[in-house]
Swiss-Prot record:
Similarity comment: family membership: Belongs to the papillomaviridae L2 protein family.
Record PTM: Highly phosphorylated.
GO terms under biological process: microtubule-dependent intracellular transport of viral material towards nucleus; symbiont entry into host cell; viral penetration into host nucleus
InterPro entries: Late_L2
Major subcellular site: virion
Residues spanned by motif Nuclear localization signal: 2-11, 515-522
Organism: Human papillomavirus type 60
Swiss-Prot/TrEMBL keywords: Capsid protein, Cytoplasmic inwards viral transport, Disulfide bond, DNA-binding, Host endosome, Host Golgi apparatus, Host nucleus, Host-virus interaction, Late protein, Microtubular inwards viral transport, Phosphoprotein, Viral penetration into host nucleus, Virion, Virus entry into host cell
Assembly information from the UniProt record: Interacts with major capsid protein L1. Interacts with E2; this interaction inhibits E2 transcriptional activity but not the DNA replication function E2. Interacts with host GADD45GIP1. Interacts with host HSPA8; this interaction is required for L2 nuclear translocation. Interacts with host importins KPNB2 and KPNB3. Forms a complex with importin alpha2-beta1 heterodimers via interaction with the importin alpha2 adapter. Interacts with host DYNLT1; this interaction is essential for virus intracellular transport during entry.
Protein's UniProt name: Minor capsid protein L2
Subcellular location as annotated: Virion; Host nucleus; Host early endosome; Host Golgi apparatus
Length: 525
């Protein structure tokens, strides 16, 4: 058994390349890596002539940034300082010299730095501008009403809160070992100018109220409701538009189903299945196609309790004993699918069923037939006929309806009119009552008529109320002894009902009313 040879690691690329320079064998990968002729280097050279990829750190070397590492952008590299002995240059007489720095104070000979003295009572807030006062120049035009040029004063107030300078002084040592300090004075700030416009908008003078020294603690605000303010505007007034205004859009056609995406896929799949060149299109107007399609295929009786329209119906029929179908369009139908509903281009509903006909049978018993698409278009419900009604009581002239109940009269008690009073004679009628050509009508019966009424013999106090026939009033009749009492005559003969005998007519008695007698026959039977 052979011992396994241990793999020895190859020397570094730098050492191998040095040996190549001395004449040793040089692997091609080492030479290409050191000389920069690898595939990646060539691609960088090719694309570098087209695209500029400088300062991106793209290369085949390490990603460590070298021995010194990466430097952040925008910062300068500060060399690390190593502790050591500082040797200062000397002059004759052994006078030590300090180098002059750029604004950074160095250590003086005495070992002490100049210190700025700060007053203990000064404010702890250091303002941006110090020592130098602000000079304010007020330029005004002609003096307006109530405001003259002599009332404007120029005030300059220094702020001596903090004593010091903004920059550090430069310190150097002289020959006699004395310290000289150079104060750097900051530049003078620009002069502020205030321009007063004396033009007034009205004829009334503007009253200016000045207050003395007012601090934030005792500030008072006076509000006068009777006073009116002036509107001050600078520049042109530009109307601002609404920001983030909601967008308005119109939907061309809203979805008609709750799932438009799935519905569209279903319609597409159904159209491909029912409407293609391999399916025969067969319209029908058979009413049984909507509810009981089996009655259109064959003569049979089906129990409605076991009928299911949601399944595919199959009809077993031998071709040798073919019977005629109730509907000629459904002849030789072997299979009929469930009902499918769709919408036509005219907006009506279409009921479709996919069927298969058994028109051919092979010797092996296989039945072959064409697929047929039976569909029934349900007609839409027409709109009801509208009949224009005519206006009742129409007239050829204009008229106006006046309702006195709905009319209103407004009386203003505070308003007084001087039209005068209306006299009473205006309210009286001017017509005189005249009875010329008048006719007096008595609502009584004629004298020639007589009425026969049964009465009681005289002597009995009885009052009768007889209604008048000619008018709808009541007349009171008092009985009197002078009246003639008419008593109706009683007939002597007894009144019997009249009987008429017609000798020119005859009648036939119904046969069941006659008694049956043996061996007796009537002449008219």
């Amino acid at each position: 058994m052979y011992a396994r040879v241990k793999r020895v690691k190859r020397d570094s690329v730098e050492n191998l390349y040095k040996q190549c320079q001395l004449g040793a064998d040089c692997p091609p990968d080492v030479r290409n890596k050191v000389e920069g002729t690898t595939l990646a280097d060539r691609l960088l050279q090719i694309f570098g002539s087209i695209l500029y990829l400088g300062n991106l750190g793209i290369g085949t070397g390490k990603g460590s940034g070298g021995a010194t590492g990466y430097t952040p952008l925008g910062t300068a590299r500060v060399p690390a300082s190593t502790p050591g002995t500082v040797i200062k240059p000397t002059r004759p007489f052994s006078v030590p010299l300090d180098p002059i720095g750029s604004g950074i104070p160095s250590q003086p000979v005495g070992g002490r730095l100049p210190v700025d003295i700060i007053d203990a009572s000064a404010s702890s807030i250091i303002p941006l501008q110090e020592v130098l006062p602000e000079t304010t120049i007020i330029v005004g035009g002609d003096s307006g009403p109530g405001l003259g040029a002599s009332e404007i004063d120029i005030v300059s107030e220094p702020r001596p809160d903090v004593v010091g300078v903004d920059t550090q002084p430069t310190v150097y040592t002289s020959i006699d070992n004395t310290v000289a300090t150079l104060d750097i004075t900051p530049a003078t700030p620009p002069v502020k100018k205030i321009i007063l416009d004396p033009i007034s908008s009205g004829s009334e003078g503007a009253a200016a109220i000045t207050f003395s020294d007012i601090s934030a603690a005792d500030l008072n605000v006076f509000v006068d409701p009777q006073g009116a303010g002036d509107r001050i505007s600078f520049g042109e007034e530009i109307e601002l538009g609404p920001i983030n205004q909601p967008a308005q859009f119109e939907i061309e056609e809203p979805p008609r189903t709750s799932t438009p995406g799935e519905g569209f896929q279903r319609v597409t799949t159904r159209a491909r299945e029912l409407y293609n060149r391999f399916v025969q299109q067969q319209p029908t107007q058979n009413i049984d196609f909507l509810g009981r399609p089996s009655r259109a295929v064959q003569f049979e009786f089906e129990n409605p309790a076991f009928f299911n329209d949601e399944v595919t119906m199959q009809f077993e029929q031998d071709l040798q004993e073919v019977a005629a179908a109730p509907d000629q369009d459904f002849a030789d139908v072997r299979e009929l699918g469930r009902a499918r509903f769709s919408e036509t281009s005219a907006g009506t509903i279409r009921v479709s069923r996919l069927g298969t006909k058994g028109t051919m049978k092979t010797r092996s018993g296989l039945t072959i037939g064409q697929k047929v698409h039976f569909y029934f278009d349900i007609s839409d419900i027409p709109a009801a006929e509208t009949i224009q009604l005519r206006t009742l009581g129409e007239s050829s002239h204009d008229f106006s309806a006046v309702d006195n109940i709905t009319e209103s009269t407004y009386i203003n008690l505070t308003e007084t009119t001087n039209e005068g009073l209306i006299p009473d004679n205006i309210l009286e009628d001017e017509f005189t009552e005249n009875f010329n050509n008048a006719q007096l009508i008595f609502a009584t019966i004629d004298e020639g008529e007589s009425m026969i009424m049964p009465t009681i013999p005289p002597g009995v106090a009885l009052k009768l109320f007889i209604p008048e026939i000619a008018a709808s009033v009541l007349n009171v009749v008092h009985p009197s002894s002078e009246w003639t009492i008419l008593i109706p005559n009683v007939p002597d003969e007894i009144i019997q009902p009249a009987m008429a005998v017609d000798v020119y007519d005859d009648f036939y008695l119904h046969p069941h009313l006659l008694r049956r007698r043996k061996r007796k026959r009537l002449d008219f039977f």
